Amino acid sequence: YNPSMHALCVFCGSSSGNDPAHLDLARRFGAALARRSITLVYGGGRVGLMGALADAALAAGGRVIGVIPQLLMDKEVGHTGLTDLRVVDTMSERKWLMGELSDAFVALPGGIGTMDELFEAWTWTQLGLQRKPCALLNHRGYYDPLIAFLDRAVEAGFLPPRHRALLLVEQDLESLLDRLEASFGN
C-alpha cells in the first residue's frame, strides 16, 4: 500500500479580498490541482476565493467536491455546478466531512472561517486524531503576522516545537503541492 494525495482540502475566503493577486492565486491553485489529478475538497461556496478556486479546477477538467451547511445553501451561496455537493447540518459537520474526504489540508488567504478550519485540522493532527498534513500558503506574506504569532507561542512555551513543525508553510503554490505530494512518497 502506497498512500498518496488523491484529494486536497482547501480552506480560503468566501470574500475575494481587496488584492486581485489573491483571486488569481485561487484560480491558479484550482487549475494546478486539476493538472495533478488531485480532487479539490472545499467549503462548497460559489463566491469569493472559494468560487474562483472551484471554477478554475472545474474549467481545467478537475473533480471538485463541496461541503456546505444547509444555512449557507439557504442563503444561496452554494455552488451548484460541482462534481459533487454535500449538504450538512452544521459547520462542525462540514469541517469533519471535509477532513474525511481529504488526504491533506491547505489554507489560502481568508478570514476567521479559514483560520477556524485550519486550526481545527491542525489540532486533529497534533492530537493524533488523524495523520494528514496541514499547510499554509503564505502568498505575498499574507500570513506573516500569523507565522510570527505561532513563533511567539513557541517562545512563550504554549506551542511545542514539534507541533509547530506539523504546519508546513510555503510561499509558492507549486512548491507547496510538491512538498505535500512528497510527504506521501509519490
Identify the role of each PLM range.
Residues 86-125:
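Internal catalytic-core helix/loop-beta-alpha segment
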